[in-house]
A protein has these predicted regions:
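Short, solvent-exposed coil/turn linker segments
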Residues: 17, 30, 43-44, 125, ...
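Rieske [2Fe-2S] iron-sulfur-binding domain
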Residues: 47-168
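Short Pro/Gly-enriched beta-strand edge/turn motifs at strand-loop
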Residues: 36-48, 115-119, 303-307
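Short, contiguous pre-domain boundary segments
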Residues: 4-20, 172
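Basic/polar N-terminal segments that are highly enriched at the extreme N-terminus
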Residues: 1-8, 408-410
């Protein structure tokens, strides 16, 4: 097993050693220490809106079914028949009345209860043979699972903290406008690290238009060149906080990235240009606002949750991102766009306009991650220092090292 000692193997304030990004041994450790033991974001409730709707999720050796029960409860089960272990549902999504094993037709209802076992005979006890459940929690329409026997107990505190930020967007009542899967040719940690800083955002010409170009700067560090942008930000922030106060929307950052098992950060902040949405002109992409907000000028709600997700909530739509490792050098990034349940494509929103910024940003990040993975695979790679604006990357690596160390000590 690859061993991580944060005080020796990882120089504090520096990136991780190359083998922790590239080796098969480290990848197996990551699955066991992180993905088998954490709370993981996997789907949004609108993806499984109706009874019988399901999504299957692959996580290392595991396959999990997320399904909407007939009583509208969101449930999660291991995708393994209790008869002889066959996979029940194929990868992807769909809708079923019951879950029927394709091998011997054992049949389960949407609560996981075994209804029928072919050739079982009289007296056969179906009771103990329900599908094996997986821990599942929904936070304002965002669905998390944990494969651990005893999931991190701090999830309740996390949920209580972020719910006031998320609830006003009513994501559980939204609908999926579209979903995009891409495979990035890099380790999952590089995908997460890339999202935790914006010093590379000059490589995102579509995204950076709606972001104030003062990321990572303190007021005393603002150069004459950036002074107009800083003054524009100051004015926008004053208007933004006044609006948040009027609408009772929390906005101040809460940051606990590396001090707890369920590390997270959440904040609402203003956007540049029209200040309404992640579009090339900053104007709303959907005329039907989420939750029927009275104004589109609410900036962005940003949330990051260790180890595998980040989210953006706008007044007009929301975007969720789920990171799922496939191999040491391949990672699935699933992006989902949510709009008001009554919004109509072609009338209330244009799909290309809605998705352009993050489709382009994801594609650009895919290139950055591939280059980073190629670099950390090179024998010449030596871990480099994180700069002050990259403190969230450093926090992610510290959180990761703590999880692996805890796993190795048990």
């Amino acid at each position: 097993m690859t061993t991580i000692d944060e005080n020796s193997l990882r120089t504090p304030g520096h990136s991780l050693p190359g083998p922790l990004y590239t080796s098969a041994e480290a990848y197996r450790t990551d699955l066991a220490a992180v993905f088998d033991r954490s709370w993981l974001f996997v789907v949004t409730e609108p993806e499984i809106a109706e009874p019988g709707d399901y999504v299957t999720i692959a996580l290392g050796r595991w396959s999990v079914v997320l399904i909407r029960d007939d009583d509208l409860t969101v449930r999660a089960f291991h995708n393994v028949c209790r008869h002889r272990g066959s996979r029940l549902l194929d990868p992807g999504s769909g809708s079923v009345g019951n879950i029927v094993c394709p091998y011997h037709q054992w049949t389960y209802d949407t609560s996981g209860r075994l209804l029928h076992a072919e050739s079982s005979g009289a007296g056969f006890d179906r009771g103990p043979l329900s599908l094996r459940p997986v821990h599942v929690r929904s936070v304002s329409g965002l669905v998390f699972i944990s494969l651990a026997a005893d999931p991190p107990a701090d999830f309740d505190d996390f949920a209580a903290t972020v719910t006031p930020y998320l609830a006003p967007h009513r994501l559980a009542e939204a609908k999926v406008a579209t979903q995009l899967d891409i495979v990035e040719n890099g380790n999952w940690k590089l995908v997460m690290e890339n999202n935790r800083e914006c010093t590379h955002c000059g490589g995102h010409p579509e995204l950076i238009r709606s972001l104030f170009p003062i990321y990572g700067y303190q007021a005393d560090d603002i150069s004459p060149r950036l002074r107009p942008a800083f003054e524009r930000y100051t004015k926008a922030h004053q208007e933004f906080t006044a609006t948040c106060s009027e609408l009772d929307l929390p906005w101040k950052p809460v940051e606990e990235l590396d001090s707890r098992l369920t590390g997270f950060r959440i904040e609402r902040e203003p956007l540049d240009l029209a200040g309404e949405s992640f579009t090339v002109d900053g104007k709303k992409a959907c005329t039907r606002l989420l939750a029927d907000f009275p104004t589109a000028r609410l900036g962005r709600l940003s949330m990051h949750v260790q180890p595998n997700a980040w989210f953006h909530g706008l007044a007009d739509h929301a975007v969720t991102f789920s990171v799922l490792p496939i191999a040491p050098d391949r990672t699935l990034l699933r992006t989902t766009w949510l709009v008001h349940k009554d919004a109509v494509e072609g009338r209330d929103y244009d799909l290309d306009r809605l998705t352009t910024v993050w489709r382009q940003t994801n594609d650009q990040d895919r290139t950055f991650v591939a280059r980073a993975h190629a670099g950390v695979s090179d024998p010449a790679y030596v871990p480099g220092p994180y700069l002050p604006p990259e403190y969230q990357v450093d926090a992610f690596c510290s959180w990761y090292a703590d999880r692996v160390t805890e796993h190795q000590q048990q």
